Amino acid sequence: MKLQLMICLVLLPCFFCEPDEICRARMTHKEFNYKSNVCNGCGDQVAACEAECFRNDVYTACHEAQKG
C-alpha cells in the first residue's frame, strides 16, 4: 500500500509547469483517462489519485497560460 502511494506521488514534479506531453508521458503507468480528465483509480489510494487529478487541472491551466 505504501508503494502504491509513493507511485502516486511520482507525478509531483509535473506541478511545476512541465509541458503537457512530458506530464502525460510521466503518467503513462497511471490509471488516468486524459480524454475525459477522470481518475479511474490508483490502486486503493483513491485520495491520492484524486489529488493527481487536481494537480493535472492546475498544471494544464498553467501550461495553457504559458502559451498565451
UniProtKB/Swiss-Prot annotation:
Principal subcellular localization: secreted
Which GO terms of the cellular component aspect does the record hold?
Answer: extracellular region
Name the domain of life. Answer: Eukaryota
* Entry keywords, A to Z: Amidation, Disulfide bond, Secreted, Signal, Toxin
Tissue specificity, in the record's words, reads: Expressed by the venom gland.
Q: Where in the cell is it found?
A: Secreted
The leader peptide range reads: 1-17
Disulphide bridges, residue numbers: C23-C53, C39-C49, C42-C62
Q: Which residues carry this modification: Lysine amide?
A: K67
User: What molecular functions are annotated in GO for this chain?
Assistant: toxin activity
Report the family membership: Belongs to the helical arthropod-neuropeptide-derived (HAND) family.
Per the record, the domain comment is: Is exclusively composed of 4 tightly packed alpha helices (no beta strand is present).
Q: Could you tell me what this protein does?
A: Toxin that paralyzes insects. May have a direct effect on the insect central nervous system.
Miscellaneous comment in the UniProt entry for this protein: Arose via modification of ancestral neuropeptide hormones (ion transport peptide/crustacean hyperglycemic hormones (ITP/CHH)).
The name under which this protein is listed is U1-agatoxin-Ta1a
**Which organism's genome codes for this protein?**
Eratigena agrestis (Hobo spider)
